[in-house]
């Protein structure tokens, strides 16, 4: 932010800064820096006196102040060079001026009347097209006459309605600002004076018309809509705004509110931010993949096919219309669009069904029905199937019945097999030494696993094995009443827990 102030050193500048910050909209740090710079120069400030001040702020940055006869110009530079390069864009700065009475000596005055005016100022030296702001405040002021001429240019605009005798009043030594103190005091005219009872205090009195500062600032500078910043109070900070790109706009368009500019800039920023997300979305376009290898759409041909999922589960391979993604039949449809007439019910098991399946034994019996007996406490199986796996009976079947059961499971549309059992899903048909069938899967094109590939299958022996294994499923101990114990043996043994170590005919 660029601030230009003109004031005399005879005023208690620290108290002036606090009062100025209270009634206007400057930040405390910058006003305190002005007060420090003014209080260090105890000599009277004339236009021919100028100095270049440099100091470090609390944030670690550097501030440079240009002091020309009470005309203080200061800017704050950032700490790092990278941040400084970012801020080198063309910007509009706020010019704030305070006018004292030039006809009196600054050291002899205890009361200083001034006015604050705001206007945009450009870094290139170009100022607002108003008559009041046609002078660059950075020009070198050689003497007091040039400084008074600078004030005269500002005074023309203020008393434009009565400005017929402006030059004559200046030649006669009349006070440029004090002349308006009694006759036609304009809005925003303030007076600072010392309170002799309290030397450290400064009194502020409004001598102008009781009009809001917001309306006065609007009338003085129409090319910058800063009056909207005063809605929340006078303690707002005026920040630099980026220069408008269109230089040939009319004065009416320049008087638009800053809120509209913020809305347009926010909309442009949102549009620029949403563009990468749209590009990412277009790159990650989902491709339909079917279970059959023939229906898989190749990535190279995805742009030349419609790709809409049909009712039978396949994808539409029709060439889309030129300039579109879909064909004429599926115009405007999504990839996973399903017609509302077809409703696929979702078969989700209820809580009751889940509880029933959890509280049963679950062993698959030879007739392919699950055992629904309640398991023993703290176990998964019932008393009859203790220690058995779910598919234990499946391995006790002969190969023909086993193949038949597998084919029946494949023919059922409701069951979904996760593994491809065509060719490689058959188990080995060989029998192990303990009489049980081999549980290894046979490779494709053979009926034996790698261990039993040289052995031949004896169907007679398999039937004997079946009868033997069927008799080995139960304990088989003959009870006193002539019946046979049908309890399942302990894992790794031939007898149950009750008849452990007993013979059949004992």
Swiss-Prot record:
GO terms classed as biological process: regulation of DNA-templated transcription
GO cellular component: cytoplasm; nucleus
Xref: InterPro entries: Effector_transcript
Compositionally biased residues, Low complexity: 273-288
Keyword presence, Phosphoprotein: no
Molecular function (Gene Ontology), one example: DNA binding
Tissue expression profile of the protein: Expressed in rosette leaves, stipules, stems, flowers, siliques and mature seeds. Expressed in the vascular bundles of xylem in shoot parenchyma cells. Expressed in the remnant cytoplasm of differentiated fiber cells and in protoxylem element of parenchymal cells.
Sequence segments annotated as region (Disordered): 234-298, 404-426
Residue intervals of the GIY-YIG domain: 185-225
Function: Transcriptional regulator involved in the regulation of cell differentiation in meristems. Binds DNA without sequence preference.
Protein name in the entry: Protein EFFECTOR OF TRANSCRIPTION 1
């Amino acid at each position: 932010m660029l601030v230009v102030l003109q004031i005399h050193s005879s005023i208690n500048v620290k108290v002036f800064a606090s009062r100025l910050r209270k009634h206007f909209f400057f930040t405390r740090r910058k006003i305190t820096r002005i007060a420090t710079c003014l209080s260090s120069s105890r000599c009277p400030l004339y236009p021919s006196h100028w100095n270049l001040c440099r100091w470090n702020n609390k944030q670690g940055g550097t501030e440079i102040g240009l002091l020309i006869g009470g005309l203080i110009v200061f800017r704050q530079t950032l700490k790092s060079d990278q941040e400084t390069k970012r801020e080198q864009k063309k910007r509009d700065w706020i010019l704030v001026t305070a006018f004292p009475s030039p006809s009196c000596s600054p050291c002899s005055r205890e009361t200083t009347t001034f006015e604050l005016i705001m206007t945009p100022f450009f870094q290139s030296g170009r100022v607002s097209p108003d008559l009041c702001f046609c002078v660059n405040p950075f020009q070198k002021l050689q003497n007091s006459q040039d400084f008074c001429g600078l004030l005269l240019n500002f005074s023309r605009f203020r008393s434009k309605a009565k400005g017929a005798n402006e030059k004559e009043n200046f030649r006669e030594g009349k006070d440029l600002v004090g002349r308006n103190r009694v006759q036609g005091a304009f809005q925003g005219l303030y007076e600072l004076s010392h309170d002799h009872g309290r030397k450290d205090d400064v009194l502020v009195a409004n001598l102008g018309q009781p009009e809001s500062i917001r309306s006065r600032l609007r009338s003085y500078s129409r090319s910058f809509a800063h009056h909207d910043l005063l809605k929340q109070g006078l303690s707002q900070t005026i920040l630099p705004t980026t220069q408008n790109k269109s230089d040939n706009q009319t004065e009416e368009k320049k008087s638009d509110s800053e809120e509209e500019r913020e809305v347009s800039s926010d909309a442009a920023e949102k549009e620029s931010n949403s563009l990468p997300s749209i590009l990412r979305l277009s790159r990650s376009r989902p491709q339909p993949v079917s279970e059959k290898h023939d229906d898989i759409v190749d990535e190279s041909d995805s742009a030349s096919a419609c790709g809409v999922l049909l009712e039978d589960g396949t994808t539409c391979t029709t060439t889309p219309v030129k300039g579109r993604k879909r064909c004429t039949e599926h115009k405007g449809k999504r990839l996973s669009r399903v017609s509302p007439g077809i409703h696929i019910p979702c078969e989700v098991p209820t809580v009751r069904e889940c509880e029933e399946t959890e509280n049963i034994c679950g062993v698959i019996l030879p007739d392919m029905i699950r055992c629904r007996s309640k398991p023993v406490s703290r176990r998964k199986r019932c008393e009859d199937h203790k220690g058995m796996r779910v598919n234990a009976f499946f391995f006790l079947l002969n190969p023909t019945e086993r193949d038949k059961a597998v084919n029946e499971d494949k023919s059922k549309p409701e069951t979904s097999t996760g593994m491809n059992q065509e060719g490689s899903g058959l188990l080995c048909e060989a029998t192990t030494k303990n009489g049980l069938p081999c549980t290894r899967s046979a490779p494709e094109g053979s009926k034996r696993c790698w261990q039993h590939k040289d052995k031949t299958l004896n169907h007679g022996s398999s039937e004997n094995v079946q009868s033997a294994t069927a008799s080995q499923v139960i304990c088989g101990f003959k009870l006193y009443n002539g019946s046979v114990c049908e309890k399942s043996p302990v894992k790794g043994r031939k007898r149950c827990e009750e008849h452990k170590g007993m013979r059949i005919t004992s």
